[in-house]
Design a protein with these regions (language model features):
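Alpha-helix initiation/capping motif
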Residues: 16, 107-109, 200
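Charged/polar, solvent-exposed surface patches and flexible loops
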Residues: 22-25, 67-71, 90-94, 159, ...
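Alpha-helix capping and helix-coil boundary motifs
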Residues: 81-89, 176, 196
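Noncatalytic regulatory segments and standalone regulatory/sensor domains
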Residues: 132-221
């Protein structure tokens, strides 16, 4: 079982960005507008329970691109916690039978092709596009790593899973041609006049100040 999804890989993409762009293209709705609403940098110096810089950064790219992915490309995403490995496996099989890949969270410590494999616990996401039943493995795309396909042993997913992402082409959305000028106008003014720029700039200054005084690379990794 293998779906014909082609990875979308860009140097500036996070792992989630790559998955979302890949799915937009898979549903024949090229991803070009999914970042249009994003302009931001979010950092909470005193975030409760966070003791590393990575935990204090808020990854707004994923949130904004998901909103725009639905609004402009009509691709809905549902982020779900996996109760256990068996239920996750059944969800993957069901979605693949319906010709839709599934995004899965995978701790990089258990991702064999990742540089952090067996070294560091880092949040990561891959896209399951098929099954290799003979080897009890999942066939995955990981645009963040390369444009190739990877086989993920079931034992690795069982140790490193947490949540999954379901994708759906929303037929209820208005499919009329989009007005690019109107979209640009809307997003420019929403970014410029709701105070987002000033907030982002203040967060950048706070992050730079904290980083210059408190960075401990060993603790961060």
């Amino acid at each position: 079982m293998l779906l014909a999804a082609a990875p979308v890989r860009r140097e500036y993409f996070s792992c989630i960005d790559g998955l979302l762009a890949t799915m937009a293209n898979y549903f024949s709705s090229p991803y070009g507008l999914m970042f249009i609403g994003y302009m931001g940098f979010e950092y909470l110096s005193d975030k409760p329970g966070a003791d590393t810089f990575g935990e204090k950064l808020l990854y707004g790219v994923g949130r904004y691109s998901r909103d725009a992915l639905h609004k402009y490309h009509h691709v809905k995403t549902s982020w779900c916690d996996a109760e256990n490995y068996r239920s996750l496996h059944n969800t993957i099989v069901h979605s693949l039978l319906n010709q839709v890949p599934v995004g899965v969270y995978l701790d990089s410590f258990y991702c064999p092709w990742n540089l952090a494999y067996q070294r560091f616990h880092i949040n990561h996401y891959v896209l399951v596009i098929g099954l290799d039943m003979g080897n009890e493995a999942y066939i995955c795309l990981d645009p963040y790593a390369s444009a190739g396909k990877y086989k993920l042993p079931g034992s690795c997913l069982q140790k490193g899973f947490r949540e999954y992402i379901l994708f759906e082409k929303d037929p209820s959305e208005n499919q009329e041609p989009l007005s690019l000028c109107g979209i640009l106008h809307e997003n420019y003014y929403s970014n410029a006049y709701i105070g987002r720029f000033e907030k982002n700039y203040s967060a950048i200054l706070q992050f730079a100040d904290d980083l210059s005084h408190n960075i401990d690379i060993a603790h961060e990794t």
